[in-house]
A protein has these predicted regions:
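Conserved "right-hand" nucleotidyltransferase catalytic core of DNA-directed polymerases
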Residues: 60, 64, 68, 77-279, ...
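Conserved DEDDh/DEDDy metal-dependent 3′-5′ exonuclease domain
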Residues: 1-99
Length: 292
């Protein structure tokens, strides 16, 4: 039946509606048949206030989407909800037709193809060496703990006089404020500050400070970043040994993609500290047939 229809207008049709209909009804809705109003909304204004959901568009157009959550069995309320969704999508398509007059049809066709490719990428995921990652994480965390202990020996707790007693505040190596205070006590003259006047402490700035304490802090921040990445990858690794990060193809004002759960665009470059080790964790299921 799908062959008899020239165009399907759907909101999130490329990623959801068309694949679901093909799976459940045996239809063969092709990518070229789908006009996806979600992609159009994102393409014409990536940072649209309120977002791109059909519900948000219902509020903008003064035609509320409605609220229905129980899809256990078919009933008249469900049908009414479906019909209202359909009418709202029709109104949205009309609205976006006007918005899209300044855009070429090729721009939409390109984004539609990209979305389909990214959907396949998300479905496939990336093979991940979980065992090696956990071993690598343990190695880095061990050094982290050593630096934490070393910092406690170098910087004794600060004494704070309260009304009735003396309180001792231990040094926190993860506190940039405390790091700035202790380095200033050792003679450091910071040159970069926030708008509120707080000292800016970063890995890059610490690398320029010729003090062994500053180098220790810089090293700790590096380990903190790498262990954070490793933990996110390990947590996201599924039972089949693959990680499937989410990718939003049209989420930034410049049209660049946005990534999360985890951010697969943040894998360190091979030339950066521990970059080679991090990248070696990403592999292929069958090295005889695939390469990464």
């Amino acid at each position: 039946w799908s062959k008899q229809i020239d165009q399907f207008i759907m909101h999130n049709g490329v990623s959801f509606d068309a694949p679901i209909l093909n799976r459940l009804t045996g239809s063969n809705i092709k990518l070229s048949q789908v006009r996806d109003t979600l992609i159009e909304s994102q393409l014409y204004n990536p940072t649209r206030e309120g977002g791109h959901s059909l519900s948000s568009w219902g509020q903008r157009l003064g035609f509320l989407k409605g609220d229905y959550n129980d899809f256990t069995t078919f009933n008249e309320d469900m049908l009414e909800y479906c019909l209202r969704d359909t009418e709202l999508t029709r109104k949205l398509a009309h609205k976006l037709s006007k918005e899209g007059e300044k855009f070429s049809s090729k721009s939409y066709e390109l984004e539609r193809k990209v979305r389909a490719i990214v959907d396949q990428q998300e479905k496939n995921g990336f093979a991940f060496n979980l065992r090696e990652a956990m071993s690598f994480l343990a190695t880095l965390e061990e050094e982290q703990h050593e630096l934490e202990n070393q910092a406690q020996e170098m910087f004794k707790p600060k004494e704070v006089q309260l009304k009735t007693k003396v309180k001792y505040i231990p040094f926190n190596i993860a506190s940039r404020k405390q790091i700035a205070e202790r380095l200033e006590e050792l003679g450091w003259k910071p040159s970069k500050f926030t708008d509120k006047g707080n000292v800016i402490v970063s890995e890059e700035i610490l690398n320029t400070v010729k003090m062994p304490e500053a180098q220790m802090f810089s090293r700790y921040f590096l380990l903190q970043k790498r262990t954070g990445l490793l933990k996110a990858w390990i947590e996201a690794c599924q039972d089949d040994g693959r990680v499937r990060g989410r990718v939003m193809t049209l989420r930034t004002i410049t049209g660049r993609m946005a990534h999360n759960s985890p951010n697969m665009a943040q894998v360190p470059a091979v030339y950066s500290p521990y970059g080679k080790e991090c990248r070696s964790l990403w592999t292929v299921s069958n090295p005889d047939t695939h390469v990464l």
